[in-house]
Amino acid sequence: MKHPGLLDLSELLRGLKPEVRPGSFVMVSTNSQSGLQALASVDEDEGTSMVLEQHKADAFRLEYSSVFAWITLTVHSSLDAVGLTAAVANTLASAGIPCNVLAGFYHDHLLVPRDRVDDAMAALSRLSASVPEDDVPPASLESF
Protein backbone atom coordinates (compact mmCIF):
# COMPACT_ATOMS: atom_id res chain seq x y z
CA MET A 1 0.00 0.00 0.00
CA LYS A 2 1.38 3.38 -0.99
CA HIS A 3 1.34 6.23 1.55
CA PRO A 4 2.92 9.17 -0.26
CA GLY A 5 2.23 11.92 2.28
CA LEU A 6 2.20 15.66 1.64
CA LEU A 7 4.74 17.36 -0.62
CA ASP A 8 3.63 21.00 -0.49
CA LEU A 9 5.70 22.95 2.05
CA SER A 10 2.88 25.33 2.95
CA GLU A 11 0.50 22.44 3.65
CA LEU A 12 3.16 20.66 5.68
CA LEU A 13 3.90 23.71 7.80
CA ARG A 14 0.24 24.54 8.40
CA GLY A 15 -0.40 20.95 9.43
CA LEU A 16 2.67 20.38 11.65
CA LYS A 17 0.60 19.60 14.75
CA PRO A 18 3.60 18.83 16.97
CA GLU A 19 3.06 16.47 19.90
CA VAL A 20 5.42 15.72 22.77
CA ARG A 21 6.04 12.04 23.34
CA PRO A 22 5.99 11.22 27.06
CA GLY A 23 9.34 10.48 28.67
CA SER A 24 12.96 11.57 28.59
CA PHE A 25 15.34 10.35 25.91
CA VAL A 26 19.08 10.16 25.37
CA MET A 27 21.43 9.42 22.52
CA VAL A 28 24.27 6.98 23.10
CA SER A 29 26.92 5.33 20.99
CA THR A 30 27.81 1.73 21.64
CA ASN A 31 29.59 -1.18 20.01
CA SER A 32 27.42 -3.68 21.87
CA GLN A 33 23.66 -3.74 21.39
CA SER A 34 23.08 -6.72 23.67
CA GLY A 35 19.68 -6.37 25.31
CA LEU A 36 19.12 -2.82 24.11
CA GLN A 37 15.89 -1.88 22.37
CA ALA A 38 16.59 1.37 20.58
CA LEU A 39 13.74 3.64 19.55
CA ALA A 40 15.94 4.71 16.64
CA SER A 41 19.45 3.78 15.56
CA VAL A 42 22.10 4.58 12.99
CA ASP A 43 25.10 2.35 12.31
CA GLU A 44 28.22 4.49 12.04
CA ASP A 45 31.89 3.59 11.62
CA GLU A 46 32.53 4.52 15.27
CA GLY A 47 29.65 2.46 16.65
CA THR A 48 25.87 2.35 16.70
CA SER A 49 24.15 5.58 17.68
CA MET A 50 20.92 4.83 19.53
CA VAL A 51 18.05 6.84 20.91
CA LEU A 52 16.92 5.25 24.17
CA GLU A 53 14.59 6.09 26.99
CA GLN A 54 16.75 7.68 29.66
CA HIS A 55 15.86 5.11 32.31
CA LYS A 56 16.97 2.27 30.02
CA ALA A 57 20.32 3.94 29.32
CA ASP A 58 20.74 4.41 33.06
CA ALA A 59 19.91 0.74 33.72
CA PHE A 60 22.68 -0.28 31.29
CA ARG A 61 25.03 2.37 32.74
CA LEU A 62 25.49 3.98 29.33
CA GLU A 63 27.03 7.42 29.11
CA TYR A 64 25.16 10.30 27.51
CA SER A 65 25.68 14.03 27.46
CA SER A 66 22.15 15.40 27.01
CA VAL A 67 18.58 14.57 27.93
CA PHE A 68 15.97 15.21 25.26
CA ALA A 69 12.26 15.59 24.80
CA TRP A 70 10.83 13.88 21.72
CA ILE A 71 8.49 15.93 19.53
CA THR A 72 6.60 14.26 16.69
CA LEU A 73 5.39 16.39 13.79
CA THR A 74 2.11 14.55 13.22
CA VAL A 75 1.65 15.87 9.69
CA HIS A 76 2.15 13.01 7.21
CA SER A 77 5.13 14.22 5.21
CA SER A 78 6.31 12.56 2.03
CA LEU A 79 9.84 11.24 2.00
CA ASP A 80 10.22 13.39 -1.15
CA ALA A 81 9.04 16.63 0.50
CA VAL A 82 11.48 19.52 0.20
CA GLY A 83 12.06 22.18 2.84
CA LEU A 84 10.28 20.88 5.93
CA THR A 85 13.42 19.94 7.83
CA ALA A 86 15.10 23.20 6.86
CA ALA A 87 12.11 25.31 7.92
CA VAL A 88 11.79 23.56 11.27
CA ALA A 89 15.53 23.62 11.94
CA ASN A 90 15.74 27.31 11.02
CA THR A 91 12.83 28.16 13.31
CA LEU A 92 14.35 26.33 16.26
CA ALA A 93 17.85 27.66 15.55
CA SER A 94 16.46 31.21 15.50
CA ALA A 95 15.13 30.55 19.00
CA GLY A 96 18.50 29.12 20.11
CA ILE A 97 17.09 25.60 20.48
CA PRO A 98 19.30 22.65 19.44
CA CYS A 99 17.45 20.02 17.44
CA ASN A 100 18.24 16.53 16.18
CA VAL A 101 15.87 15.36 13.45
CA LEU A 102 14.78 11.78 12.81
CA ALA A 103 12.81 11.07 9.65
CA GLY A 104 10.32 8.23 9.79
CA PHE A 105 8.22 6.82 6.97
CA TYR A 106 5.14 8.81 8.04
CA HIS A 107 6.42 11.58 10.31
CA ASP A 108 9.43 13.61 11.30
CA HIS A 109 10.60 13.54 14.89
CA LEU A 110 12.64 16.10 16.80
CA LEU A 111 14.89 15.60 19.80
CA VAL A 112 15.23 18.88 21.67
CA PRO A 113 16.75 19.58 25.09
CA ARG A 114 14.25 18.48 27.74
CA ASP A 115 14.40 21.87 29.45
CA ARG A 116 13.56 23.69 26.18
CA VAL A 117 10.58 21.60 25.06
CA ASP A 118 8.02 24.30 25.89
CA ASP A 119 10.05 26.87 23.94
CA ALA A 120 10.31 24.46 21.00
CA MET A 121 6.58 23.77 20.99
CA ALA A 122 5.83 27.50 21.08
CA ALA A 123 8.25 28.17 18.19
CA LEU A 124 6.72 25.36 16.11
CA SER A 125 3.21 26.64 16.80
CA ARG A 126 4.25 30.12 15.66
CA LEU A 127 5.80 28.66 12.50
CA SER A 128 2.65 26.71 11.67
CA ALA A 129 0.40 29.71 12.33
CA SER A 130 2.58 32.00 10.19
CA VAL A 131 1.75 30.21 6.92
CA PRO A 132 -1.17 31.92 5.19
CA GLU A 133 -4.00 29.87 3.72
CA ASP A 134 -3.19 31.01 0.16
CA ASP A 135 -0.21 28.60 0.00
CA VAL A 136 2.46 31.30 0.06
CA PRO A 137 5.20 30.45 2.57
CA PRO A 138 6.30 33.27 4.88
CA ALA A 139 9.13 35.42 3.49
CA SER A 140 11.59 33.80 5.90
CA LEU A 141 10.98 30.43 4.20
CA GLU A 142 11.39 31.55 0.58
CA SER A 143 15.06 30.54 0.59
CA PHE A 144 14.20 26.90 1.39
Predicted regions and their residues:
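Generic non-transmembrane alpha-helical segments
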Residues: 91-97, 123-127
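Charge-rich, low-aromatic oligomerization/scaffolding segments with amphipathic character
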Residues: 64, 117-136
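Structural preference for solvent-exposed beta-strand-turn elements
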Residues: 105-107, 111, 116, 134-136
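Regulatory modules associated with amino-acid/nitrogen control
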Residues: 1-91, 131, 138-144
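Helix N-cap motif at beta-to-alpha junctions
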Residues: 53-57, 113-118
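A short linear hydrophobic-aromatic micro-motif
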Residues: 37-38, 96-101
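Short, structured patches in soluble enzyme cores that scaffold and shape functional sites
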Residues: 29-31, 103, 114
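Generic beta-strand structural signal
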Residues: 69-71, 95-97, 108
